[in-house]
């Protein structure tokens, strides 16, 4: 799926976005990654598998920022986690996800936010704050439990 970055995210096609050179966010699976990176002219020389993601990081490469996100599932904090990779270049964001988690976050942004992503920075801010939204509530519950144990 591809969405044009504007105040309201607009669904589009990769062909249209690439032809018009419009800033956009791509939600893809690992299988689609080589094709999309080639089309966006993002050179990524290492072989990276989404199953190899075990922590959150971001690194600056020659023509993009590459990052990984390793996000705990709220109902199973110590168990399995969502694994994402992202690439950000001058015009586009590519989010790689095999689980559907990123699309669920996108749908929440579209439902809850008025200013959904006029810029790459605004979109990434919305994306990250959306999956961290309940973290403070969860931490507060743990804090209360710890205080009760004292």
Say what each PLM segment does:
Residues 1-114, 138-140:
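Helix-boundary and N-terminal cytosolic regulatory elements
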Residues 9-15, 119, 123-127:
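Short amphipathic alpha-helical segments, especially helix-boundary/capping motifs
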Residues 52, 115, 122-150:
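Cytosolic regulatory modules rich in charged/polar residues
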């Amino acid at each position: 799926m591809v969405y044009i970055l504007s105040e309201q995210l607009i669904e589009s096609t990769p062909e249209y976005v690439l032809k018009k050179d419009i800033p956009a966010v791509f939600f893809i699976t690992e299988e689609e990654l080589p094709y999309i990176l080639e089309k966006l002219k993002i050179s990524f020389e290492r072989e990276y598998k989404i199953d190899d993601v075990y922590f959150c990081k971001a690194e600056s490469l020659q023509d993009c920022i590459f990052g990984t996100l390793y996000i705990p599932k709220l109902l199973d904090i110590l168990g399995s986690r969502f694994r994402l990779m992202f690439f950000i270049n001058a015009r586009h964001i590519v989010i790689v996800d095999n689980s559907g988690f990123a699309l669920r976050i996108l749908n929440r942004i579209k439902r809850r936010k008025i200013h959904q992503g006029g810029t790459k920075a605004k979109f990434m801010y919305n994306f990250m704050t959306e999956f961290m939204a309940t973290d403070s509530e969860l931490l507060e519950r743990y804090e209360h439990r710890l205080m009760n144990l004292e």
